[in-house]
Amino acid sequence: MAIWQGASRRLSTGAKVWRAAKKHKREMGRPAAETQVSEVIKRKIVRCRGANLKVKLEKTNYANVFDQANNVCKKVAVTKVLDNKANKHYIRRNVMTKGAIIETEMGKAKVTSRPGQDGVVNAVLITE
């Protein structure tokens, strides 16, 4: 079944709202690309509205980590996801989203990019 992102047919009171127009293709959505920590790197290129392209990162084990103290950015391996505010079950499944805390070779880092939409994992090193 398709994911539809249009307005609901019900008001907050429960009253039914009669549709002024039919459902359009532009209102369709897609399942989220839940980027997982894996040895295999897997990307998916999706055509978006206006013939634009979106790179969805599905699996990876690397991240571009920026160290603010030394002002240097390195590509390092990701071992696991430590915390994810988006969903508590993402921690067990090792799913990375924006704001997730990941364990890397350099230490703990916070993801600043949107891997499911940008196609890359960028993170900032957390100093304690």
UniProtKB/Swiss-Prot annotation:
The keyword Ribosomal protein applies. Gene3D superfamilies: 2.40.10.310. One of its GO terms (biological process) is translation. One of its GO terms (molecular function) is structural constituent of ribosome. One of its GO terms (cellular component) is ribosome. Keywords: Ribonucleoprotein, Ribosomal protein. Part of the 30S ribosomal subunit. Belongs to the eukaryotic ribosomal protein eS8 family. This is Small ribosomal subunit protein eS8. It comes from Methanococcus maripaludis (strain C5 / ATCC BAA-1333).
